[in-house]
Regions:
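ABC family nucleotide-binding domain
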Residues: 2-216
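Conserved beta-strand-loop-alpha-helix hinge in the C-terminal portion
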Residues: 220-243
Length: 243
């Protein structure tokens, strides 16, 4: 199993108040799954993403990544896992405005202190941009790119180190419907090539493109179903979903 959590909990303290963001979450995700994590604001979906992506530590419980207990790792080990095992895609793209597409994609190799030379970094960044269909935009800066193109650059950056897990947090939130379809198709292509993909979303249309849908409520898993069963449940409530 690629991802395993056991009784994973996260409590934040705000003054004297204790906020239970996650409550004893048990979760398994296998290699090469494409999973949607859903829930309303405050449900715990972003907190769960932060735990899986090693951006935050649980208050209690265990998180195993490919059999390794991540919850017991120190800061240096966690940084290595984040850089090599997890790729992140965010709603706001998080691109450096003064750097072109190629330079933005190179960043994970630069920050990791990779021993690979300049030429090797450039080659890998070009290959990543080619995979997302942006070979003709490598010298464009973010302000010269459309929203969909910016997200493609962000995806290229996320897959540069060939991570085990690709995590996307509301990746279509700033995109129109046509561009959303294009980005979801790109995620499906990466999944078909063997990539494990986790998408945090509040949009049923995005979740419908995954294999499995996990819904959180009040920090707990309310449902965990194959997408066909989840869609059937949503349709029974009057929603029309398709991908």
């Amino acid at each position: 199993m690629l991802i395993e959590t056991r009784k994973l909990s996260k409590i934040y303290r705000v003054g004297v108040e204790r906020i239970h963001a996650l409550r004893s979450v048990d979760l398994n995700v296998g290699d090469n799954e494409m999973v949607a994590i859903m829930g309303s604001s405050g449900s715990g979906k972003s907190t769960l993403m932060n735990m899986i992506g090693c951006l935050d530590r649980p208050t209690s419980g265990t998180y195993l990544l490919d059999g390794h207990d991540v919850s017991r790792m120190g800061p240096a080990e966690l940084a290595k896992v984040r850089n090599e095992q997890v790729g992140f895609v965010f709603q706001s793209f998080e691109l450096l405005p003064r750097q072109d597409a190629l330079q933005n994609v190179e960043l994970p190799l630069i920050y990791s202190g990779s021993s690979k030379g300049w030429g090797s970094r450039r080659r890998r960044a070009r290959e990543a941009l080619a995979r997302v269909g942006l070979s003709d935009r490598i010298r464009h800066r973010p302000n010269q790119l459309s929203g969909g193109q910016k997200q493609r650059v962000a995806i290229a950056r996320a897959i540069l180190n060939e991570p085990r897990i690709l995590m996307a947090d509301e990746p279509t939130g700033n995109l129109d419907s046509g561009t959303t379809t294009e980005i979801l198709e790109l995620f499906r292509q990466l999944h078909e090539e063997g990539q494990t993909v986790l998408i945090v979303t509040h949009e049923d249309e995005v979740a419908a493109c995954c294999q499995r849908v996990i819904r959180l409520r009040d920090g707990e898993i309310a449902s965990d179903k194959p997408v066909a069963e989840d869609i059937a449940g949503q349709s029974a409530r009057g929603d029309q979903l398709s991908c």
